[in-house]
């Protein structure tokens, strides 16, 4: 197996995921409920068979990760579960408090690095798909170090190049997420679907420097409130789940408040929460807020930011595109799971399933 990455191996969107992984692991939960929450968040436009695979195979993938040595946060001897927007049950597994993406990807990377059957090619940017008669047989890549083109031949090719969110002024994504994977697939003749759906995360820090550091949805899951310029909550009047409504609803509601008061942000208030719990549960976010001169235990200025490409390259439930032997995985794929809007923390579990 040849693994190509256009930068260093850790620089992937999954690495920056804070909240966690959604999967049914508690006896008080059910896959039917996870299925329903996914469909509701997706505005009914999800592919039902694909969602069924996600929610039913997800718990087994989590079990396999744990058996392989992955450590998730525990509470009283059981998996610690968080609550996020659109979920009617606590089912979000997390690791390192608010560093789930980093912990899971670091764990997987260690397995890859130590696997003698996998060769890693860093600083290799894929610039073309090798194909003939609608059948892929590899890729053309540009070696960013030697500044030369290289060919990689393969029986099966998988593109996992993420989304397009870095083309927006405010984004939670790394700068490499510019849609080059989408362009590659489109130029190769792949079918593209649902590109009208771009998810904006409701709560990214607002600063004058335009840095949009993500404030995990799990912070609202722990009880943080969204308040307007008068210090009043506005989400309870908009949705029954208040601050934990699906992301599209929360992001739209925040934007309307910004227009109403002619402000660039609203406030995420944690004043009423135990500071020690906040620091323990969200150590990385707390540290980042300190760097920016923000007291996380008081209130944080937040505004929506481009976060996730819901649409992408059309695939079946195996990741197969309309071009033989070319597969798409992760955010770049449009398998129908997300519908019009992704349910929080369904992205990492989709990658595992």
Report residues per predicted region.
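Glycine-rich FAD pyrophosphate-binding loop
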Residues: 1-21, 27-28
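An anion/pyrophosphate-binding glycine-rich loop and adjacent beta-alpha core
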Residues: 9, 184, 190-301
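Glycine-rich loop(s) and the adjacent beta-strand/alpha-helix scaffold that form part
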Residues: 156-213, 260, 346-353
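Short hydrophobic core segments
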Residues: 151-162, 185, 231, 326-330
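Glycine-rich active-site loop/strand segments that organize a redox cofactor
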Residues: 23-54
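Conserved redox-cofactor binding core of oxidoreductases
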Residues: 66-148, 153, 160, 204-207, ...
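A glycine-rich dinucleotide-binding beta-alpha-beta segment and adjacent secondary-structure elements
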Residues: 121-122, 127-136, 141-142, 281-333
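Short beta-strand to alpha-helix junction loop
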Residues: 46-59, 92-110, 121, 171-179, ...
């Amino acid at each position: 197996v040849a693994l190509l990455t256009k930068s260093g191996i850790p620089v992937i969107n999954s690495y920056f995921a804070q909240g966690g992984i959604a999967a049914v692991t508690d006896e008080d939960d059910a896959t039917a409920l996870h299925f329903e929450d996914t469909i509701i968040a997706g505005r009914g436009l999800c592919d039902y068979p694909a969602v069924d695979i996600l929610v039913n195979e997800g718990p087994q993938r989590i079990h396999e990760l744990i058996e392989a040595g992955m450590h998730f946060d525990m509470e009283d001897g059981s998996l610690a579960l968080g609550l996020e927007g659109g979920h009617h049950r606590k089912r979000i597994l997390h690791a390192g408090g608010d560093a789930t993406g980093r912990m899971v990807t670091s764990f997987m990377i260690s397995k890859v690095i130590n696997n003698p059957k996998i060769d890693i090619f860093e600083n290799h940017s894929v610039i073309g798909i090798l194909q003939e008669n609608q059948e892929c047989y590899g890729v053309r890549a540009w070696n960013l170090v030697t500044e030369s083109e290289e060919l990689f031949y393969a029986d099966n090719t998988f593109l996992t190049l993420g989304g397009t969110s870095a083309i927006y002024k405010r984004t939670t994504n790394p700068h490499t997420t510019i849609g080059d994977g989408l362009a590659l697939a489109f130029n190769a003749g792949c079918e593209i679907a649902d590109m009208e759906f771009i998810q904006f995360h409701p709560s990214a820090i607002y600063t004058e420097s335009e840095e949009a550091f993500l404030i995990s949805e799990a912070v609202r899951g722990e009880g943080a409130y969204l308040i307007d310029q008068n210090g009043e909550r506005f989400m309870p009047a908009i949705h029954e789940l208040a601050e934990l409504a699906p992301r599209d609803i929360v992001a739209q509601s925040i934007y309307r408040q910004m227009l109403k008061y002619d402000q660039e942000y609203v406030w995420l208030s944690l004043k009423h929460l135990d500071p020690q719990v906040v620091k323990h549960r969200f150590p990385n976010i707390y540290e980042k807020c300190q760097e920016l001169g923000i007291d996380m235990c008081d209130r944080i200025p937040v505004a929506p930011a481009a976060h996730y490409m819901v649409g992408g390259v059309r695939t079946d439930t195996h990741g197969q595109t309309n071009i033989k032997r070319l597969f798409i995985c992760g955010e770049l794929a449009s398998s129908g799971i997300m519908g019009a809007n992704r349910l929080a923390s369904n992205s990492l579990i989709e990658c595992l399933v």
